[in-house]
Amino acid sequence: DMSGLIKKGEVGSILNEVDPVRVNALQRVAMEESRLGIPLLMARDVIHGFKTIFPIPLGQAASFNPQVAKDGARVAAVEASAVGIRWTFAPMIDVARDPRWGRMAEGCGEDTYLTSVMGVAMVEGFQGDSLNSPTSIAACPKHFVGYGAAEGGRDYNSTFIPERRLRDVYLPPFEAVAKAGAATFMTSFNDNDGAPSTGNTFILKDVLRGEWGFDGIVVSDWASVAEMMAHGFAADSKEAAMKAVNAGVDMEMVSYTFVKELPELIKEGKVKKSAIDDAVRNILRIKFRLGLFDNPYVDEKRIEELYAPSHLEAAKQAAVESAILLKNEKETLPLQSSVKTVAVVGPMANAPYDQLGTWIFDGDKTKTVTPLKAIKELVGDKVQVI
């Protein structure tokens, strides 16, 4: 019962609600029926577009043009905020150099500097000129840190990154977005040399807050607090909650160890009340910066802003700039006019949904154009297309 949990003050953020009517109804419960009246923070993975879809981040990075990334994030923010989303779990700025790793497409590749520049551009696009604008959404750079260096390219796996390499290769993109004003950070699933990021005081307190002066929200990745048990870093959910909070995690995503375990941990003195106060301040600070206390509701008429012509034009331009051209050394192109039959082959030839790319929740496959369809429309009845 989501409304019941909100009334009891057990929910501060909600994932994946994209119906503006429902968003407003849940906000009304929080504002009018809970004891403290603190607005909810609505979140969604908006990675490379909301309704208007842009090239995958790896493709955007191939443009070598940060304006492409910034424009894409700005369009995504306008559209996502139109349904009540005010927080996205992006950009992913994990430097990744092992192509076996399954999330390469969500990042910007192997280069630290390019990842830094594109990451900053995305943060600026998502957050706009001011976080309290109703068309801005809080960015959440992820996964902090070293997630893309998982041993053997196996997701969630351990990493073994010495501090010098950490500072030379993997930390710089995160430092860049922190200094660019990123509102939130997400911890990563991996452990580094035995210490999972979600329970790693060195990176969360010493580096992120101490060295870089970050004062926003640190959120765990999906159940990554509980995942510390799988890493052998915590014996049970109680120890996992203790280590996460004491390391500097403000908000737990999905798993329920904070709600379940923190009251007892505080009584036992294993978690100080000051740690809870710090976490609450960090969360409230971002909600204030987003203007949620002034206006927690979304204008339901804004849904008309989806698929605006200017948004589609920006996506087209991004696709053009992201294209990788091959040398025409043997003059394969252009096809000679004598050709009467063209075969369009491959798994992507006529797959409408796959044209959207990875990590898409809200794109509409009926609005895509497959290579097969496009080529048929281009050549008409002059050539047989199979």
Provide a role label for each language-model segment:
Residues 1-386:
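Glycoside hydrolase catalytic-domain context in secreted enzymes
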